[in-house]
Amino acid sequence: MVETDQLYHIVHEAVERFAIMEFDGSRNEINHVKVREWLERNYPNKNQKIKQMNPLLLTDGYKTGHHQQYPKGTTLVYSNFTPRSNRYAPKGCDQVVSFGQQMVMQQLHETFERDFFSRPKSEVCGEMKRELSLYLSTDYDTSHFEALHDLGYLPIHVKALPEGSLVPIKVPVLTIYNTHPDFYWVTNYLETILSNLLWKPMTSATIAHQYRKVLTKWMEKTDAERAWFIDWQGHDFSMRGMDSAEAVISSGLAHLTSFSGTDGLPAIYGARKFYGETGFVGGSVNATEHSVMCAGTKDDEIETFRNLMNTYPTGILSIVSDTWDLWKVCTEHIVTLKEEILARDGKVVIRPDSGDPVDIICGKRWNDEQNPYDENVDAIEKGVIELLWDVFGGTINNQGFKVLDSHIGAIYGDSITIERADEICKRLAAKGFASTNVVLGIGSFTYQYNTRDTFGFAMKATYVEIQNQKLSGVSTEGREIFKDPITDDGTKKSATGLLRVETDTDGNYKLFDKVSWAFENSGSLQTIYCNGKFENTTTLTKIRESLKNILTPQLT
């Protein structure tokens, strides 16, 4: 038993708020018996630290009262999660990649199983009573939480569009409704956490797909015989700039729906845990960072290059090359090391890491006449790819574009955007180089500078059922509901009633609202979770294949 003196301030606040007992503020006049009784009821396991957050706290505070606010007799709430707008999305992202529903439902399921249903009811519901009583300044009734614990599972039916498909704006990617009439409140109680977990993987998967679309376009124009290279041309460098380890998994896994290159190891774990992958998921190469180059000293940089090649005599080796003077590396060091690089069984990749990525890779002509007094002007005008060609040469492919010798290459991974990726490929092509001569690192500048509003994701209820008591008996009324704020431009207008999504003659998803249960039960939305059980599971491999097939028409 915790001594009352230790909890004096907590109890004082509780007494003032709840008027649980008469108390005049004098420490010596506390009724210790009543205090101890109250503590036993409201502070179970006081000496234990909470190891995991109670999942019932994973919601907006205002939702904790909504079970009392629905019309009397409510038995069902039906909601959907939908991208409503691409107003703030990168150019070209006119549709959203359906991705992450299976992962999110597994996370939600495991959290409730471990941290709610598997814990004593008195403990988890006692936590909620304590927290919400303090939060709302009332004696909060947790009977609905207790009933959920007694039920032993999440009574919800979740449907989703196939992961790896493209979804038009305003078409729902997920629907959810409760399966037990007593738990109508559960549907939208879960809105907050579902939105929190779903928007990022879908946003990142959509952006990754757009990168692949751009890179595929230029590969087709300049180097179609090396289509395999696209899997590796977009490389995930975002981990250090993401806002959490969880975000690295959700966003990093989203990147892997379109590419195989990644430095985000947690994403590979995510592919195994949430999508059942057992073999190869993603990969990278041996690569240096600035600390390695600095440790070798500026004056001995060329020896650092040589030592690295000796350490890794085979395979791809990426060397960060602008710790001091990128242009010296590209015009002097690699000239000295040329024969060693060509004799090596593998590719040495030069990695610039600062400046304007388009100009660094493609070159920049900053005046009409070269300044004869600036030895770097010629290098800056040419850019890395042309400088590597000057030293190592290469081949001319069937489409007439230059492809660097297989022993040398380049990667740039700082401040890359979809627009810059497109411009790099465009300018390389204009100079006669294949777009496949460079790998682009995609970082948090791409994957972290987004919010739920990037695609306007929102979860809204569109249908409820109300049970009415009449003299003739009990009847159930289905109400088609919607929101359409008069002060909005139409973005926030929701669908109405039960929903069905199906493909049109062009293979595009189309939404039909105000349908019957019979029509809702079929269509493209597939059940993925119902009453604690998973259905229609998929794999990352299938998702990748689906997204690649979408781009196949470009390859004709």
Model-derived segments and their meaning:
Residues 38, 107, 111, 131-135, ...:
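Residues that form generic nucleotide/phosphate-binding pockets
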Residues 1-43:
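Protein-protein interaction and targeting regions used for scaffolding, dimerization, and localization
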Residues 37-40, 350, 539-540:
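Secondary-structure transition/turn motif
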Residues 100-139:
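Aromatic- and Gly/Pro-rich amphipathic surface segment
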Residues 47-90, 132, 140, 146-155, ...:
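Buried, small/hydrophobic-residue-enriched core segments of structured protein domains
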Residues 45-114, 259-260, 264-265, 270, ...:
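Gly/Ser/Thr/Ala-enriched C-terminal appendages of enzymes
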